[in-house]
A protein has these predicted regions:
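Feature recognizes metal-dependent phosphohydrolase scaffolds
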Residues: 1-166
Length: 166
């Protein structure tokens, strides 16, 4: 019963588990997350859950059929870290931020002008660790692997709190 993403209009800040696709605007991302949330709360939930696992499709298209469309949404919001050429998903990558010669790039380095000045906060990338860039903040500091939990004060983007024990 949790949203796939949260958008704070007053702060122009979007919070998502893994990321948003570079071919989507902020409004489209919100709309796709809402579509998925409605399905998960409705009578199609069981069918969506039965069809949600898999690494395909890897390329976004408005023509994706319903289960491929939902799987793509789920993979972007919850699993995506890097993209290959033509903004295709690479869901197997688990390393640190790739170097320029690896033929992959972090999803947030797509130079998407559709995101304007929205700050996007995400996790799901403990190998990347805490990362603060002007528009992007990765808060995954590896708590699930026994490292610290990191939190951020949204009123002051650079005021961090690390909690070493839960």
């Amino acid at each position: 019963n949790r949203p796939f993403l949260h958008f704070d209009k007053n702060r122009n800040t979007l919070l998502v588990h893994a990321g948003i696709h570079p071919e989507w605007t902020i409004d489209e991302s919100i709309s796709y997350a809402s579509e998925l949330e409605r399905l998960m709360k409705g009578n199609q939930c069981k069918n969506v859950l039965e069809n949600m696992y898999g690494n395909d499709p890897i390329k976004w298209s408005l023509d994706l059929n319903k289960y491929n469309r939902y799987r793509f949404f789920i993979n972007v919001f919850t699993r995506m870290r890097v993209l290959r050429s033509a903004n295709t998903l690479d869901l197997k990558y688990k390393g640190t931020e790739p170097s320029s010669g690896e033929n992959i790039q972090p999803w947030f380095e797509s130079n998407n002008q559709n995101w304007n000045d929205t700050t996007i906060i995400f996790g799901h990338w403990s190998a990347l660790g805490l990362m603060i860039k002007p528009q992007f903040i990765c808060l995954d500091s590896g708590c699930v692997w026994g490292r610290s939990l990191t939190a951020i004060n949204l009123d002051s983007k650079f005021k961090l709190t690390k909690i070493s024990h839960l």
